[in-house]
Amino acid sequence: MSDFSASDPNQPPPVAGQGGSPPPPPPPNLSPPPGYQAYSAAPTPVSGSLSRVSGLSKAVVILAAVAAVGSVVTAITTPGAVDSARQFRDGAISESRFLDDYTAYGLTQTLQGIGTLATAVLTIIWLYRIAKNVRVMGRATTWAPIWAVFGWILPPVLIIIPFLMVREMWKASNPDVGLGAEQWKQGDENPLIIVWFVLYGIVPAILTVISSSNALSAGFEQDAEDVARVLDESGSVTILGSIVSAVAAVVWILVVRQLTARHVAFTNER
């Protein structure tokens, strides 16, 4: 009679091979099931069809040009808005006159922001397609396609992610490296991507810190006097930021055109 008893639930059941017959041996000629793939530390290539990027890149270029024009207009109109703010602070014009001038100035900034936002949305789709295509082509990239989305919406301190991703997509789209080869990882760099990152990421981050300190000093509930003071004190930063944004948009247009041409040659898009 076995020592295991249902009346003693704290006692474990007997283990095969201990006090009983040994377990049967595995059947010979075992083979993995169909579709089985061994674990690999490398990123898994994406299956599916290639997506077209050339037409989308043209839309990105057009919207980036619109954003650049908006930045130039903002840079041109800012001195007038700053002058109006100073006159209001000195009592030379009324509050209603200053607010009218500021509303017109704010409209140009709004239009610039809309152009920039539209460019960002299409850029995300464009970069996602490129990241997916290179994996369909067998490139084991570090940055998965989903990072084309999250890389732009994560906190600003992680703005380096889009730079690293665009940089890797440039290398992965090298048409001179055959499929299955890994030499693309040591491929040539595009210096324009670095210039774009400095103009789009680093310089605006510094300017944002400077302008934010002026805005926060006025508090969240600002009256016309507070708005005029902030505009007066941060006018030069706004002008510089608009110029940098315009140049960054132009550089981005060049990056998009060059990366698209390289990627189209790699995927043989027609």
Residue ranges and their predicted role:
Residues 1-48:
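Intrinsically disordered, low-complexity Pro/Gly-rich regions
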Residues 29-72, 80-99, 122-150, 160-201, ...:
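Membrane-interface extramembranous regions at the lipid-water interface
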Residues 201-208:
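Aromatic-anchored segments of alpha-helical transmembrane domains
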Residues 209-246:
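Extracellular/periplasmic helix-loop-helix junctions in multi-pass membrane proteins
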